[in-house]
């Protein structure tokens, strides 16, 4: 589930920044960092992001789909009906749970990952490749 979150959040780009203010590999919001912590430091960002993901997994009783929704929309989302989730959270849980399920089954392909890429993920990954100096696959 860790790799799924990092894929959706940043495509592995430790310098990713969102318009909402989230930063780094796990797109962690500023209020999750202690004063003086560097949110762009991959280790610090991963620590804060994974702590929040662990909290979401705990609150969801280990339900990956609910934990993904909580990671994206806030822990309180876990207790709400999906009908009350923000559209972004619904999409995040949909893509994330499918990508995670495929990875958990050691699938060599993922229709859900392909769908996420077509829905905008490819642009995120292209930006990550360019920023990190990684050539696209031929």
Functional labels for PLM-detected ranges:
Residues 1-3, 16-17, 59-70, 107-110:
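Surface-exposed patches in mature extracellular/periplasmic domains of secreted proteins
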Residues 18, 39, 80-82:
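Short acidic, glycine/proline-rich loop/turn micro-motifs
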Residues 103-138:
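N-terminal secretory targeting signals
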Residues 17-36, 48-49, 92-96:
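Substrate-binding/active-site groove segments that recognize
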Residues 1-13, 46-50, 67-74, 96:
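Short, functionally critical alpha-helical segments immediately adjacent to catalytic or ligand/cofactor-binding
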Residues 37-45:
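A short, structured beta-strand-centered segment in the mid-to-C-terminal lobe
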Residues 34, 67-117:
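Catalytic and substrate-binding regions of cell-wall glycan-acting enzymes that process beta-1,4-linked
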